[in-house]
A protein has these predicted regions:
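Conserved, well-folded catalytic cores of nucleic-acid-processing
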Residues: 59-63, 85-89, 118-119, 188-196, ...
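Phosphate/oxyanion-binding active-site loops and adjacent basic polyanion-contact surfaces
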Residues: 71-83, 177-182, 240-252
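Phosphate/pyrophosphate-binding loops at sites that engage ATP/ADP/AMP, CoA/4′-phosphopantetheine
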Residues: 83-96, 194-204, 252-268
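Conserved phosphate-binding loops in N-terminal lobes of ATP-dependent enzymes
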Residues: 11-99, 219-226
Length: 320
């Protein structure tokens, strides 16, 4: 497929092209009268909380920005600036296929397409990211897609007839977003530091930020071993997967309730990020983890079927 793919999930926007893949979390940091986005902004979240906005994708609108953050009038201005930065970092591809979550409202999708018209690329397609993923990993029966966003989780229910995968509904899981999960995981890790070393990394913004920064590496280690060490500011604490499991219980319970009674042919697909949560895979026997580049592979599989260079772009929610 000659068109680049932009996966819009505020935990980590990803833009794939023929020769590159760019990642950029949905964080904006005010620097003077300008903004920094992505990993650089996220690494300042605990250090400069008043200069950070991480809600601009979730609350995409043209309502006045509250609280104010520099020259941006509304979250749409921040989305516009973030899109331009990601596009530049990816080598400025001429055309983009946009993959969006089912939690985005119709008005937000329309606004997003309007914003794209003021960017140096052409949006030639708009597809539900769960439908795109399901078309690659499908099989007959019900398919559930579990994804993490910064401020909530989302469970999307799909139906696969063998000929077509279609989105049936999307169920937000409030209080189960990445930020809430991080807070619970950090609390567990900080308790381990206090218990083992009497050092509390949450006492200072710099060490608290360091703890947040090393958390993903710790979770990756716990995916393959029962315990791991976390080091912050010269102090080291040992944490176990069993310790961390309680942090994800709210998400596991909410997802279980949203899926209802499971059938033998049902399948669950989890994004790689949510699959790092200790205890998740043990809780769902029918769960498989999507590859990190699964959406890009699915887009390439469909080729130009998803591309519309003539007329208006519509949100695709079912795919062969």
């Amino acid at each position: 497929m000659s068109v680049a793919l932009l996966d819009i999930n505020d935990c980590n926007l990803q833009l794939w092209g023929a020769d590159s893949a760019v990642q950029s979390p949905g964080y904006a940091l005010l620097e003077g009268k300008d903004y920094r986005f992505g990993t650089a902004a996220r690494s300042s979240a605990r250090l400069r909380p008043r200069d950070i906005n991480n809600r601009f994708w979730w609350q995409l609108s043209t309502e006045p920005l509250q609280p104010a953050l520099g020259p941006a009038r509304h979250t749409a201005d921040l989305v516009h600036a973030h899109l331009q930065q990601v596009h530049r970092e990816a080598g400025q591809p001429a055309e983009l296929l946009l993959a969006c979550s089912g939690s985005m409202q119709r008005e937000q999708l329309s606004l997003l397409l309007g914003i794209a018209q003021h960017c140096p690329f052409t949006a030639v397609g708009l597809v539900n990211r769960s439908a795109l993923l399901g078309s690659l990993l499908g099989g007959r029966g019900r398919l559930f897609h579990l994804e993490l966003q910064l401020h909530q989780a989302l469970l999307t229910v799909l139906q696969d007839t063998g000929d077509e995968v279609s989105v049936q509904r999307s169920v937000p899981l409030p209080g189960c977003g990445l930020l809430q999960l991080q807070e619970r995981l950090v609390e567990v890790a900080a308790s381990a530091f206090i218990r083992q070393t009497r050092f509390d990394p949450r006492r200072q913004a710099s060490t608290e930020q360091s703890l947040y920064d090393v958390l993903p590496t710790a979770l990756q280690a716990l995916a393959s071993q029962p315990e791991t060490n976390i080091e912050v500011s010269g102090y080291r604490a040992r944490v176990s997967a069993a310790d961390m499991t309680a942090a994800g219980q709210r998400l596991i319970t909410a997802a279980t309730d949203a899926m209802g009674a499971m059938q033998a042919t049902d399948r669950i697909i989890a994004d790689p990020l949510v699959a790092l949560l200790p205890g998740l895979q043990d809780s769902f026997s029918q769960l498989s983890v999507a590859d990190a580049n699964a959406l890009w592979l699915a887009a390439q599989q469909h080729g130009d079927h998803l591309v519309n260079r003539e007329g208006s772009v519509s949100f695709v929610t079912h795919l062969p």
